[in-house]
Regions:
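Conserved alpha/beta-hydrolase catalytic His-Asp/Glu region
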Residues: 134-204
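Alpha/beta-hydrolase active-site loop signature
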Residues: 33, 58-62, 124
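Short beta-strand/loop motif that positions the catalytic acidic residue
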Residues: 204, 210-212
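Active-site loop/oxyanion-hole signature of alpha/beta-hydrolase fold enzymes
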Residues: 2-15, 40-48, 52-98
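Flexible "cap/lid" loop of the alpha/beta hydrolase fold
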Residues: 101-149
């Protein structure tokens, strides 16, 4: 569904189910240069268990309008605005990679809005190598190839999907290629620059699941 956040058209996938007023929400936040589609299976699973799904496209990603946000804190503030625009008072929050930092920052600074936190493929801090950053800044395709390569295990490189015919590396590289100019650099730089994580961990009040 589309909502309005900061006067910009914003896309939120709902797992093909309408939101039900009063139901618990679960907010999914994608990683660098990705979009809501990485959460398709999880969204459908939890939607069919009665949760209101908010798999967001951050500004400048996927189907959402607007410029990319240059900081993790800024993205976290935006997520709260998206919850407000969706009339979702409280939510479970789940993030992958860059999205895990955003989810973490939301949980740390807005504890009254978050009931539990899940962080997938995460690290605090989340340093990014100079070679990757330089290639991303130059908007070279090799930056997307690096992200794709390092995002999959050895078994996935050999076609280790449980779904016959699924090519995980091929799917991700096409997703990264759909991102606009400068998006991958913006997101990687935001991860690199997020220096408040260890200190903010003291503010986390909600139960937290790490999937590493």
């Amino acid at each position: 569904m589309y909502i309005d956040v900061d006067n910009q058209k914003t896309y939120i996938a709902t797992g093909s189910k309408d939101h039900i007023q009063g139901n618990m929400g679960i907010t999914f936040i994608h990683g660098t240069a990705m979009d809501h589609t990485v959460w398709t299976l999880a969204s459908r699973h939890f939607a069919r268990r009665g949760l209101n799904i908010l798999a967001v496209d951050l500004p400048g990603h996927g189907r959402s309008e607007g410029n990319v946000i240059p900081s993790i804190e800024g993205m976290a503030d935006w997520v709260i605005k998206a919850l407000d625009a969706s009339n979702q008072d409280k939510s479970i929050i789940v993030g992958h990679s860059m999205g895990s930092l955003v989810a973490f920052d939301v949980a740390a600074r807005y504890p009254d809005r978050i009931t539990s936190l899940a962080m997938v493929g995460t690290s605090i801090p989340m340093p990014v190598g100079d070679v990757l950053l330089d290639n991303a800044k130059a908007d070279k395709h090799v930056a997307k190839e690096m992200v794709n390569f390092w995002s999959h295990s050895q078994s996935a490189h050999l076609g280790g999907s449980q779904v016959p015919g699924t090519w995980m590396l091929g799917k991700l590289i096409r997703l990264l290629e759909r991102s606009g100019p400068g998006v991958i650099y913006n997101d990687l730089k935001a991860c690199q620059d997020y220096s408040e994580g260890l200190e903010r961990s003291k503010q986390i009040q909600s139960p937290t699941l790490l999937i590493l």
